[in-house]
Every structure is written in C-alpha cells, then in structure tokens.
Amino acid sequence: MLKQNPPYREWGLILMKFLASIDVMPIKEILDPQGKAVLLGLKNLDIQGFGDCRIGKHINMEIEAADKATAESIVEDACKKLLANLIMEEYTFELTAI
C-alpha cells in the first residue's frame, strides 16, 4: 500500500500528490506486429490457449496539482501531446491520491 503524504503548500496553494497509471495501446484497426510475434512465439513453445495479443505501454507518473480535476487535465495534456501517438494509439488512465 502506498504511503499517504499530506498536501503541501507552494506559493500559497495547497498541492496534492497523485499517482497516474496510464495505459497506451495500439488502436484495434492497426496491425500489432509485436503482439503477432508474441503469439507466434507462444505457439512455437507449444503454449496453447491464447487468442489475440496486443502489446502496449504502462506508465506510472507522480503528479502534483491543486485538485484531482487539475491533475486529470495535466495527464490528458501529457497523453495527447507526448505519451500517445493518437493516430495509432489510444490511452486510458487512473489517478490515485498519494
């Protein structure tokens, strides 16, 4: 379990800390060569039972913001501008106060 830190002040504002858990995955319409390679490897190792496989990224980041809505806005901005290629990828995230 994560240790909870109390909010702290910066320039008179009380900032809270959040953990953003971000998942970035290729959109379903795009061929995923890494996923296909994993399925082929499993088949070659005679490991049965897997259907589709898609390989993506999982990112954990700490965010400091005045409130949860502001933290969500910061994470959305980071995902749209840097962490995900919106032409080929989609993202989801969860925020947890720490």
Positions of the model-derived regions?
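Short, Lys/Arg-enriched N-terminal segments with co-localized hydrophobic residues
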Residues: 3-15
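Residue-level detector of alpha-helical hydrophobic segments embedded in or interacting with membranes
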Residues: 1-2, 28
